[in-house]
Design a protein with these regions (language model features):
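Non-catalytic C-terminal interaction segments of nucleic acid-processing enzymes
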Residues: 1, 83, 114-140, 145-146, ...
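Short Cys/His-based metal-binding microdomains
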Residues: 49-99, 149
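A short acidic/basic microdomain associated with nuclease active sites
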Residues: 37-50, 99-132
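Glycine- and acidic
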Residues: 18, 76-80, 153-159
Length: 255
């Protein structure tokens, strides 16, 4: 447990939103966040380790080792039911709506959300017709006149797997980027991570900021606070529902 606490301190130092969130959420939410980061919530695996259960089985998928990471990010049943997608899309809605509201001039903004798509996708057909894996980034920012396009892809990952997710998402859109470059566009692939405990690293924030500046879009730091807060609240909801067999995704969460 000491190692978990040390990791929490390191993450807090590197996270641009953690301390801001701490001042703006109820005490019970911050308590949940601290226990989440130190692996001291009552997951099936922890209950087994604490001697309160004989087995640490996941109530949803029957995995024999239902760790906290499994419950909040890895359970296949929870994934297929849309629990993790609800968190992802809630975070995505916040950044997409903010960026779209600030876009000016020739800048267009599309996102893989119903009210932000163009003909069911995120890249206009007159720019490029592309289907299949790696054809629909989460967020697309486009300036036709300057021939610049940014492909942003969100992951709400565990702290320890953020780098792996970043590399995987970067590779996912390589072919799409090449097709767009063949059309004369300057392409920026921007994977970014809002971690499930609500952390956003300075590196991630800087990457988003630098991308938005290409389109003369400037966001306030409250955007990152809101992204972290939404991720944390969604993770809290996912955790508290892990013993509920059925899931109907509620409306996307707002800060």
């Amino acid at each position: 447990m000491q190692g978990d606490f040390t990791n929490l301190l390191i993450e807090e130092k590197e996270c641009v939103t953690w301390q801001s969130i701490a001042r703006k959420v109820p005490r019970n939410v911050m308590s949940f966040a601290a226990r989440l980061s130190t692996n001291s919530l009552a997951s099936p695996d922890n209950l087994r380790r604490w001697g309160k259960r004989k087995m640490g089985i996941c109530p949803l998928c029957a995995s024999p080792n239902a760790t906290l990471a499994h419950i909040t990010n890895m359970c296949t049943v929870a994934l297929n039911q849309g629990r993790f997608t609800w968190r992802h899309d809630s975070v995505l809605l916040q950044i997409a709506s903010t960026v779209k509201s600030l876009a000016t001039g020739e800048t267009e903004v599309f996102s893989d959300l119903p009210s932000f798509q163009v003909n069911g996708t995120t890249i206009p057909a007159d720019i490029l017709v592309s289907t299949g894996e790696g054809s629909k980034p989460d967020l697309v920012i486009l300036d036709r006149k300057r021939k610049i396009i940014a492909l942003l892809e969100l992951t709400c990952s565990l702290p320890g797997s953020a780098f792996k997710a970043h590399i995987m998402k970067d590779k996912k859109y390589t072919e799409l980027a090449l097709d767009l470059e063949a059309k004369g566009f300057q392409v920026f692939i921007v994977p970014f991570e809002v971690l499930s405990p609500g952390h956003i690293t300075k590196q991630c924030k800087d990457s988003i900021q630098n991308t938005l500046q290409l389109f003369n879009i400037r966001v306030k730091k409250t955007l990152y606070e809101n992204l972290g807060k939404i991720a944390l609240l969604c993770t809290m909801s996912v955790f508290h529902a892990y013993q509920v067999k059925e899931w109907v995704s509620p409306p996307l969460l707002a800060p």
